[in-house]
């Protein structure tokens, strides 16, 4: 079963870097393997945080982000995700499973819709109070979603940064990575403090994310 989870997590990482929505694969895989829902959330967040750390470093190295906007969004995202994760701890397994049945298809449709996003930079490079507040709000809202559910977070961030703030896809993707990094670690800390990470599963799955081939390189070239 561990081999199955490693393969599925690796595939989820590949899908996530190509089109977003890797959690649509990894979350059901953990549940199929028999992990209770809260342990599924915690273990999935562990491997996701490791993968996002690597991806964010790549985007930062290539300068494919607006660091000021990304950091502001990350602050909001950390707060929102921490709140969302604590909400998850209050919900029963049955409620969370029902949420998955409803949200998974919706997230999948929105990820497919992302293909029609404009790839045009309309940002003028300045950062005023309005833009700062918008970046914080984007981070807070998407972070809350990531803390409560998760799949599609990166895609929703790209949609927000392109449509609401006018960034091109490359920069929006980088901003989204910073946002998602903060939300992943906020959730991970919450689950770690509550003993909800299965390390003998999460560590091998996280290691596979580092070695999986990634189409991300084409975006950053």
Regions picked out by a protein language model, each given a short descriptive name:
Residues 2-81, 85, 136-143, 153-212:
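Small-residue-rich hydrophobic segments that form or flank transmembrane alpha-helices
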Residues 54-64, 101-127:
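Transmembrane helix exit motif
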Residues 130-135:
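Juxtamembrane cytosolic amphipathic helices that cap and anchor the N-termini
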